[in-house]
Every structure is written in structure tokens, then in C-alpha cells.
Amino acid sequence: MKKSGLSENFLWGGAVAANQLEGAWNVDGKGPSTADVATGGAVDKAREYTDGVLEGVYYPSHDAIDFYHRYKEDIALLGEMGFKCFRTSIAWTRIFPNGDESEPNEAGLKFYDDLFDECLKYGIEPVITISHYEMPYGLVEKYGAWRDRRLVDFYENYCKTVFTRYKDKVKYWMTFNEINVITLHPFIPAGIKFNDGENKEQVIYQAAHHQLIASAKAVTLGHSINPDFKIGCMLLYPLTYAETCNPNDVMASIEAMNKHYFFTDVHARGYYPNYMKKYLERNNIEIKME
């Protein structure tokens, strides 16, 4: 009997994100991100998002494990473990500190050049997320973040920059990490702050629509730069169980999951499924399809 197993080219590895390990939050021209205003928490204390970076407050992303300065020894350890791939992300604010600049920050671009070269030296395939639970805080303050359609253009410019720069070093890309988490935690991934009296779901789903457009544009753009790119998007899998077998509970659990899973339908098919259109209509949510 033939033994089943993983193929020799299976990408075995591990995953992190820039805001989780790089530190150096304001080094070499990097600007503040939404992750940089998230305070530390504890078992009995939830993390908070402050209005900008405050003195004397502990922000885990500011130092992290100082991967920015120690990546060579860390990648060497991964190579020693036999990693075939390493998923991490590019910090948007290392490349465009405020998010809306026309020219990128060369120091940030060079860091990722060096990081990817180090990975490839050990035969480790970089798997890169373009936006992983962070975005320029400058875009939050100036534009209201992803609620503004102009964010699509800023993101596309960012994608064009990194796709072009790393087209011969990175093959595997993800446009967003867990793009559907915006429905649960709107600030960290999308920079959404609510005004008094707003229909929060209206804001969330309009911002999500902008991110979906940006994700689609990134795929088209990436393949125009390098047809061999493998580009996808990471989604959160929030499973909801019905409390009882009562049909009302079962339908409520299905609707709860549909609010997250429709992102998959849009990515795969290019349009909103009918169940989501009905949900939006029932809740007086009008998406500007532009």
C-alpha cells in the first residue's frame, strides 16, 4: 500500500505579521499605524486604541521582538528548522509613512529587500501579506480611513510599489489578512472610528466594499506586473453554532456566519450573493457600488 504524505515541495513553515514582531515603529522614516496606537492588555484589562501615540503608555508593537534589527539571526533559526516558507507582512507605513505620499520611503523598501534576500538564502519562500491588521494612522486622521473611496487609490499605489520592487523575490501574496474581521473589529484592520448617531453597519459595509474593490484591483495589477504571482486573500473563519435546534436559532446562526462568509463569495465570483443583498436591504444599508 502506498503511504500518503506531503509532497516534497509542500510549503511547510510559519506565520507572523510586521506589527507583531518588527518593532522599530518609528525608525528609518516609518510612520505610525493603527497597530501602533493599540495599548497592551492583560487578563483583566482589554486593549485600548488611543487617539494617537501617547507618552508613558505601553504599545506592544513599538518594540515587539525587534525583528527589524535581528531578522538575520531569526531567519537563520527558521532555516535550521527546515522551513520552506515564511509568512509575514509588509508594514504599509514603512513604505508610505502617511499613506498618501506619491513617492515611497526607500529605507523601508530596502529593509524588505534585505529580509526577502535572507529568506531566499535559506531556501525559504516568502509569503507576503500586503495589509495585516494595520494601516497608516495618517489615513485615519485625514480621510476617515477605509470609509473613504480614495483609500482604494492609495492602496493600489502601495501595491504597485511593492509588486514592482519585489516581483523577482516574492511569488505568493495576500491582499489583506482576514479581510472580513472588519465586521467584528473595525479599527485595527480598517481604521474605522464612529461618529455619534451613525449607522455603524452602514459605515462598516461601505468600508468593506472599498477593501473588496482594492483587493480585486490588487490581483489584476499584480498579474500585470508578474503573471506568475499567486495572489489571494486571507479570511477569518468565525464559526457560529445554534443554541438549540429551534429553526429560529438555526437561521440566526446561519445569518451570523453569512455576514462574514460573503467576503469569500465576492472574491470568488465578483458579485454580492443574494443572501447578503437581502441582509443589507433589511437593515437599511445602502452600498455605493463604485
Identify the residue ranges that each predicted region occupies.
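A short acidic, glycine/proline-enriched capping/turn motif at secondary-structure boundaries
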Residues: K84, T93-I95, Y133-M135
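Active-site region of glycoside hydrolase catalytic domains
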Residues: M1-T50, L54-E55, G99-D100, L109-E290
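Catalytic domains of carbohydrate-active enzymes, especially glycoside hydrolases
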Residues: R70-A91, E125
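Glycine-rich, proline-tolerant flexible connector loops at the mouths of alpha/beta enzymes
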Residues: I90-P104
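Short, solvent-exposed segments of well-ordered alpha helices
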Residues: H62-I65, H69, E103, Q202, ...
